[in-house]
A protein has these predicted regions:
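N-terminal targeting or regulatory segments adjacent to alpha/beta-hydrolase or S9 domains
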Residues: 1-68, 323-325
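Cap/lid segment of the alpha/beta-hydrolase catalytic domain
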Residues: 98-155
Length: 325
């Protein structure tokens, strides 16, 4: 895609995002920075121990489980997800967990379900998770998300990914992989720095740290939002000195099992960030796509390419058996 069109799509999305209530709440929450930094630098951000989730199925596909990291809001303490089993003997196959972007209802509700048939053909089950404070887990009565609440939400999201991973492995799945886009890629990256049970990960245009162009307010036309974001530069710089910044940690799985996807025309998460993590993570495979943060989804054959990359890494034996079921 030509750069001007890709960037116009991103710019338009940025204007819409600036008006979304949950985004505005995050922008207004410039408090509890000291507590957030202490939490992120402490052992409770991503604890060593992770217990398997206790899934309860509401239908053949939809499930819930109690979050392993509780907060004061009942709505956010219940994790919602979907499991798309490949076959009746689904436990014999790897599972790919799909993680959506921030306030990214379209990917979660439309793109991910559309990917399921291809994932099944690749010999895998598919699962999705709703990130903290998103969709069914939204909390309207919060006036502002301060820095501590945002930090805790990141820790909660990682804990929930690890809990679902534990449940899948306990069920007998030979391996678990992650595909995360934007915010989901950031959460997948954090999980990959702490959980060696993960077999392979794909970080598609991931967030890497708190301080980037969109959080500076660059390109936002709505003046009140832009000014609020501009005032938080020092806070973001402080947060970027903690393990929330992916470039300050190393993954615990081999770099051969990590795939980075970059949008060369990305206006929301600039490509320099993926280059930075590519270098600090010892140069795993990276695909530099001629697209923006949103238009990369239009790349012809991208799902097939990703699944062709993932399939042999998740479990070669299970993949070789896929044609028999």
């Amino acid at each position: 895609m030509i750069a001007p069109l890709a960037q116009f799509i991103d710019w338009s999305a940025l204007q819409v995002a600036a008006m979304i209530p949950s985004i505005r709440k995050c922008a207004r929450g410039d408090s509890k920075l000291t507590e957030a930094v202490e939490f992120l630098n402490g052992p409770n951000f991503i604890p060593a121990e992770s217990k398997p989730a206790a899934l309860e199925f509401k239908s053949k596909i939809h499930f819930t489980f109690p979050s392993p990291r509780l907060c004061e809001f009942v709505e956010n303490n219940i994790v919602h997800g979907r499991l798309y089993r490949r076959a009746k003997d689904w436990r014999k196959f790897p599972t790919l967990i799909l993680l959506h972007g921030g306030v990214d209802f379209v990917t979660h509700r439309c793109r991910f379900p559309a990917m399921v048939p291809a994932i099944h053909r690749a010999g895998c089950n598919a699962a999705t998770l709703v990130a903290p404070y998103h969709f069914q887990r939204g909390v309207r009565r919060v006036e502002a998300f301060d820095h501590l609440r945002v930090a805790e939400a990141f820790g909660q999201g990682v804990a929930e990914i690890r809990a679902l991973t534990g449940w899948l492995l306990n069920q007998g799945c030979p391996s678990v992989g992650l595909f995360g886009y934007s915010l989901g890629g950031w959460l997948a990256g954090l999980a990959a720095t702490s959980d060696a049970r993960l077999k392979a990960i794909v970080l598609a245009l991931p967030g890497v740290r708190r301080n980037y162009r969109a959080t500076h307010g660059e390109g936002i036309l709505w003046t009140p939002m832009r000014k609020v974001l501009e005032k938080q530069t020092a806070a973001r710089e402080a947060l970027d000195k903690t393990p929330l910044n992916l470039t300050l940690s190393q993954p615990v799985l081999p770099k051969e099992n990590i795939l980075l996807m970059q949008g060369r025309y990305d206006l929301l998460v600039e490509p320099e960030l993926s280059e930075e993590i590519w270098q600090t993570w010892k140069q795993p495979e990276i695909w530099r796509l001629p697209h923006g943060h949103l238009s990369w989804m239009l790349t012809r054959g991208i799902n097939r390419r990703v699944l062709d990359w993932l399939a042999p890494r998740l479990d070669p034996q299970a993949i070789s058996e896929k044609g028999t079921h």
